[in-house]
């Protein structure tokens, strides 16, 4: 029979490999000026939601999220198919609501400059025939665009990132920093901001796809960028989700998550970009009472559930007892480090010698209750 052992970072058997990883969560309050800019958008959003609720297209609930908007769009489409003329008006309102919802989330979690980029792109799409002009013509949106033209960035995340990065690189001039964000507009603006600081050499790392005037990176460009980061030509890489997996992204001394991600797996992958062979830190940025906070809680719950399921799996021993491993099976595996690939057999023999009796006698791990 074969055992599946579940290890946490503080397990004694892992102490020889333990590398210090400090995780810091920063909960940031939105400034009053930004909250005031959001208020008219929120009021209009709530009015439209109330209208759709009265018409039966939107669920009656306090918080309306992306899924509720998608279901309302489906409800409007069904009404149109059934020749209910109200469906046409509902579909138009829902389309505007979707864009307003995105706009408000961008202002709350990314900042005013990213929101402005979203509106400018909507204007470009409107000229190409996309149905964005109606949303842009809304008085609340028009007034917001006028206000944004006269304002510098208001969101506290960007200056905090600049402070974290410069502190890290001043303390470790040879250090590397990896910043993750969901939005390419945020990538662009963070690179611009960080490069105004003398110790920082920042650049972008994004996916292949192109969207309008925003061009993606080819695989050749991605690999070249990673090599620049690895060699120290650049010391800060600002990446979208493409940097989470699949590519050999070098380890970083500091990882900054510009916003939480709803997937526990993705959060673990991002954290795993630091503290591989030496100490590192992770900083998670959360705008208080926004989508950030809900997403962060959801990700934490997912991670807790993953651990509980693994504990259950171990306890139930849901492994194929009849499966027999060939004694030479280890020859098919290797242990990959940052510098070399070691045959699994050789690695295990070396570790048994290094740990001595503890490695031989350690046959079962105590599971958490």
Protein language model regions, located:
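Conserved small/polar residues in nucleotide/adenosyl-binding loops
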Residues: 363-369
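SF2 helicase motor core recognition
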Residues: 238-251, 272-274
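C-terminal helicase lobe
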Residues: 289-361
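Conserved RecA-like helicase motor core of SF1/SF2 enzymes
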Residues: 248-269
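Conserved helicase ATPase core of P-loop NTP-dependent helicases/translocases
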Residues: 209-239
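Conserved segment of the helicase C-terminal RecA-like domain
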Residues: 274-297
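Conserved RecA-like helicase motor-core motifs
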Residues: 5, 199-215
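Helicase motor interdomain insertion/brace
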Residues: 3-15, 33-192, 196-197
